[in-house]
């Protein structure tokens, strides 16, 4: 792992899997030592080799078209939770599982849907324990829908269309919050997901 020396003082804002999308004022992290990258590390091996930052030092995370490339997404989210301050915000942008964008890229290893993000919270593990020890509460999922295909439809009609037709959602954005201390894995602690639909 390679860590830059000019990270400033915490709390940090961490741009995870930044690639060439360098964000000014953020700590930019990627698996490749590209210009502007502050921390180089392998996002697939975070259970064995954690990110070289102290616990509870990051209050904002950005993962823009990253998580769909990661085989061990639970390991990634667990490591980010370690770094998160209580109440830290993570914004995850991904292709919707019902779009060609989710499947055409051979480097994508899994598809995501609005309810997928609940599996990064503890209450979703009331039935089974996979060793995941983190708790991210999905606050809102925004579906950016094809403006032409959804013209004249109300939000419920659009949402129904996203459930049964392909390529309606161009992009999905999930906003999650780090819950610390971690909640118990109890079904009754699950909360309803707020879904926002916006034209793209």
Residue map of PLM features:
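Conserved alpha-helix/loop element of class I SAM-dependent methyltransferases that forms part
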Residues: 1-12
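Short secondary-structure boundary/capping segments
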Residues: 5, 30, 164-166
């Amino acid at each position: 792992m390679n860590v830059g020396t000019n990270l400033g003082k915490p709390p940090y804002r961490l741009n995870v899997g930044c690639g060439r999308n360098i964000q000014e004022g953020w700590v930019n992290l990627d698996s490749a030592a590209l210009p502007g990258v502050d921390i180089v590390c392998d996002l697939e091996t975070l259970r064995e080799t954690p990110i070289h930052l102290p616990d509870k030092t990051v209050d904002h995370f950005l993962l823009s078209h990253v998580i769909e490339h990661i085989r061990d997404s639970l390991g990634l989210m667990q490591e980010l939770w370690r770094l998160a301050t209580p109440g830290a915000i993570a914004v995850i942008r991904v292709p919707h599982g019902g779009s060609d964008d989710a499947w055409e890229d051979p480097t994508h290893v899994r598809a995501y849907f609005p309810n997928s993000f609940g599996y990064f919270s503890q209450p979703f593990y009331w039935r089974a324990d996979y060793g995941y020890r983190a708790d991210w509460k999905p606050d809102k999922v925004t579906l950016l829908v094809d403006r032409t295909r959804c013209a004249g439809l109300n939000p419920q009609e659009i949402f129904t269309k996203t459930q049964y037709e392909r390529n309606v959602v161009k992009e999905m954005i999930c906003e999650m919050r780090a819950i610390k201390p971690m909640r118990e894995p109890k079904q009754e602690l699950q909360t309803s997901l707020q879904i926002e639909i916006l034209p793209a």
